[in-house]
Every structure is written in structure tokens, then in C-alpha cells.
């Protein structure tokens, strides 16, 4: 009996050829991940990897009234009855790790991660129950230029992978005094419209007032549009902090806009929040977001420590890159040896190992199909170089390398073709 994948998950696979599923091609993921490592290294961020599952209480500080905690977590009991949860987001586990490792803490801690997340999402396009997230967390420093630096890293990532039509949207939620003052104003406003709000927003009115601004329900939109903006109620100190972030973005020519309705879906955010928005194909949607969360570490049992960060869903990033035509399969510069006759098998086996020791990616076609069919397969699979080897090549000690991309070939002794292959791989962009 065939066993199918559960709903909401997918394989990242190396042999995909159809356009619809090309976003799942392993090589595309490698390319994006390589850019992440390069950009984060430029900014002095170090990779962190946390366990796939944590004690469930780790995620309660995300906000017990958040959709993630209430509806989307994969939570189970182990054999001793302890509640464990598959990681639904990246920040809370890193905060847990930071608190767990006090001897490893520095005054300024800069982490990044590329990890799978697990959420019981409703089935819809672009939403997956296992998805992959790139994120950074900067823990230990509170400074507007640190926030701007994190935003700069995010922007440089988008630029480096070739995303277009991007803009940063920002809002400022303020500290506890600003939030308390604004909460009173917002509660009074929504109370006037309570009967017209969606059932979800009526629930949030009593549990998480600010999240009403994040509602996607049609009946809430006109009411939200007229809600008083929080920036009218921030303190002078908060406004100065926010303005310094905006000035820094302008200095780096990073396009941004202020969205006074922007709040984040996780309850731990304070002060600056942001989303990276692309407008493409007649639609606008977020490709990442984050903000500052100065209260989360203390709420999680640690010493009060300022922090900020962001998360980016990689599935949507790769799909958008393909839609914009800015991501293609890279050439592997792979060499495939084709033993035309069984007598060439041993030679191919030994030479392939030598070629690999030189740094030339090499594989052997052991199918022993006819040469024409073997060449057609190599062409379909976008193998860059092939070398058919039979009795004639073994006797003459002359080998021919076919460049399948350029439809060219070159011949010579074993040492000569090795040198030519090294040159081609190091100096040719195919």
C-alpha cells in the first residue's frame, strides 16, 4: 500500500523538472541558504541550531492568546506525560538557549538560524504545516542603530538573492507607558463599533486588543482604517528613537513607509515592528517581518535583556524569486563518465576517484545504456561535461570531453583533459 505525505508538507528534491514544483528543487534552496550564510557573516552573526521540539511552556511566552499558541502548535505528551511542542517559531527557543547558557553569553549576542517550523495551518496556497524560516536575533543591545542594522541585514539579503519591488513597512508600538495609554484610547474606539466587529475581533477585544488591527476579516477593515494611530500617543523619547531608525534607513537608501496599523502576530513585540513587503503581479504580501522584544527574556525567566530580530519564510521567498524570473538552477559543472563497454568500468571507477581528489565533481553512469541514450539523459539532467570511454579511448589514451551546455568538445591525454576541466570549472560561468 502506497503511503502518501501528510497534508501541508513537501519534499525538497534534486530531480524536479516541472515549473510548478521547481521551487522545491534542492539546488535553489542551496543557493538561497548560501546567500544567507554569506550575508550574516558580513554582519558578524553566528549560526545557532535549536532542537526540533521544546518543553511546551517555552512557547507560552509567545502569547497565550496568539493564534500560534491557541490553534497552531503541534503539542504532544511523551511517555512520561511531559508536554512537548514541535518548534512553531524561532525566537522563543533562542531565548531559551540564551538563558540556558549563561557562561556563553556576551554583552552583544548575534545569532541567525535556518530551521524548519511546524504549525497546524489551514490548507491554503503558500501555507505549510512544516515550513522553513531564516531569522536573526540580536540580544543584549538597545539602540536605534542596532534596529536599523538588523533591517539593513534583512534588506541586503533580499538584494543579494535578487528580489525586486520590495519595501520595508514600519510601525512603533512604544514601551509599556505608551501601550497603556494607547490601549485606553483604542478600547474606547472599538467599543463604539463592537457590534460591527467580526467574531474573532470581538474575542480579541477582551484578550488582545492590539491584534484587532491585524484582522483580515472583511467586516473589520473600514473600522480598522479609521482607528487612531499609535504614533499619535508615543512619548517624545519613543518618537526620537523611531525617527533615528528612519533616518538611518534613509541614509542607506532603503525604501520604507510607515504603516500605523502594523502589528505583529506574536505578543512579545515592543517598540519598532516591521514587515518586508513585495508588490508583484497585482498583489502585495509580506516576505518577512520582525521587531524589538525587550520584555521576552525576562518573561521567560532570564535577566531583563533587550533584543530584536526578524523571521523570513523561505518557501514564499523562493516562489517569489521564480515568479519574478530572478532565480534559475545553477550549473553544477559536473562531469559524468560514461563507460561505453564493460571493459572501461574499472578505468572509470579509479579515474573518477582521482578527479574528485582534484576537486572536479565526478559521477559515473553505471546503467550501460547505449551512448546516444546516455548522452540524451545527461543533457536532460543538465550535466555540464560528459566523457564517453570505450575500448578506443583506452587503447589510444586519448579522451574527449563534451561540453553539453556549449555544444563543444575538447580532447587530449588524461592529464591534459584534467587541466582543461579545472580551467573550465574555475573560469567559466555557464
Swiss-Prot record:
Q: What is its main location?
A: cytoplasm
Q: State whether keyword Protein biosynthesis applies.
A: yes
List the GO molecular function terms. Answer: ATP binding; histidine-tRNA ligase activity
Keyword tags: Aminoacyl-tRNA synthetase, ATP-binding, Cytoplasm, Ligase, Nucleotide-binding, Protein biosynthesis
Provide the protein's localization.
Cytoplasm
Instruction: Please give the biological process terms from Gene Ontology that the record holds.
Output: histidyl-tRNA aminoacylation
Membrane-traversing stretches: none
- Write the Enzyme Commission number(s) for this entry: 6.1.1.21
What reaction does this enzyme carry out catalytically? tRNA(His) + L-histidine + ATP = L-histidyl-tRNA(His) + AMP + diphosphate + H(+)
The protein's assembly and partners: Homodimer.
- Homology family: Belongs to the class-II aminoacyl-tRNA synthetase family.
Kindly give the NCBIfam families that the UniProt entry links to this protein. Answer: hisS
Name of the protein this chain belongs to:
Histidine--tRNA ligase
Question: Which source organism?
Answer: Chlamydia caviae (strain ATCC VR-813 / DSM 19441 / 03DC25 / GPIC) (Chlamydophila caviae)
Q: Top-down, what is the taxonomic lineage of the species of origin?
A: Bacteria, Pseudomonadati, Chlamydiota, Chlamydiia, Chlamydiales
Amino acid at each position: 500500500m502506497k503511503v502518501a505525505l501528510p497534508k501541508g508538507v513537501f519534499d525538497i528534491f534534486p530531480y524536479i523538472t516541472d515549473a510548478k514544483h521547481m521551487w522545491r528543487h534542492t539546488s535553489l534552496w542551496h543557493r538561497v541558504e548560501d546567500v544567507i550564510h554569506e550575508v550574516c557573516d558580513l554582519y558578524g552573526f553566528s549560526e545557532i541550531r535549536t532542537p526540533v521540539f521544546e518543553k511546551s511552556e517555552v512557547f507560552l511566552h509567545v502569547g497565550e492568546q496568539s493564534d500560534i499558541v491557541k490553534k497552531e502548535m503541534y503539542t504532544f505528551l511523551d511517555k512520561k506525560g511531559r508536554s512537548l511542542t514541535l518548534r512553531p517559531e524561532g525566537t522563543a527557543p533562542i531565548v531559551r538557549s540564551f538563558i540556558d547558557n549563561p557562561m556563553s553569553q556576551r554583552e552583544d549576542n548575534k545569532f541567525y538560524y535556518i530551521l524548519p517550523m511546524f504549525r497546524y495551518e489551514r490548507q491554503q496556497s503558500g501555507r505549510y504545516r512544516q515550513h522553513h524560516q531564516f531569522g536573526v536575533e540580536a540580544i543584549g543591545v538597545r539602540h536605534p542603530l542596532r534596529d536599523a542594522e538588523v533591517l539593513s541585514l534583512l534588506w541586503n539579503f533580499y538584494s543579494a538573492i535578487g528580489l525586486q519591488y520590495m519595501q520595508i513597512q514600519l510601525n512603533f508600538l512604544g514601551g509599556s507607558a505608551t501601550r497603556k495609554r494607547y490601549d485606553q484610547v483604542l478600547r474606547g474606539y472599538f467599543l463604539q463599533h463592537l457590534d460591527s466587529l467580526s467574531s474573532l475581533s470581538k474575542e480579541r477585544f477582551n484578550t488582545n486588543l492590539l491584534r484587532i488591527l491585524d484582522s483580515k476579516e472583511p467586516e473589520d477593515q473600514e473600522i480598522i482604517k479609521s482607528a487612531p494611530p499609535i504614533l499619535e500617543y508615543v512619548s517624545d523619547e519613543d518618537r526620537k528613537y523611531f525617527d533615528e531608525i528612519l533616518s538611518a534607513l534613509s541614509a542607506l537608501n532603503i525604501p520604507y513607509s510607515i504603516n500605523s496599523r502594523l502589528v505583529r502576530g506574536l505578543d512579545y513585540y515592543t517598540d519598532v515592528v516591521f514587515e518586508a513587503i513585495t508588490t508583484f503581479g497585482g498583489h502585495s504580501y509580506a516576505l518577512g517581518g520582525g521587531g524589538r522584544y525587550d520584555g521576552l527574556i525576562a518573561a521567560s525567566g532570564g535577566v531583563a535583556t533587550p533584543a530584536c530580530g526578524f523571521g523570513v519564510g523561505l518557501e514564499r521567498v523562493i516562489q517569489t524569486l521564480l515568479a519574478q524570473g530572478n532565480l534559475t538552477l545553477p550549473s553544477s559543472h559536473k562531469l559524468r563518465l560514461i563507460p561505453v563497454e564493460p571493459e572501461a568500468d574499472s578505468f572509470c571507477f579509479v579515474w573518477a576517484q582521482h578527479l574528485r581528489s582534484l576537486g572536479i565533481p565526478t559521477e559515473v553512469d553505471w546503467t550501460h545504456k547505449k551512448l546516444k541514450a546516455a548522452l540524451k539523459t545527461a543533457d536532460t539532467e543538465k550535466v555540464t561535461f560528459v566523457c564517453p570511454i570505450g575500448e578506443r579511448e583506452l587503447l589510444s589514451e586519448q579522451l574527449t570531453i563534451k561540453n553539453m551546455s556549449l555544444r563543444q568538445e575538447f580532447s587530449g591525454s588524461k592529464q591534459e583533459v584534467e587541466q582543461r576541466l579545472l580551467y573550465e570549472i574555475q573560469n567559466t560561468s555557464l
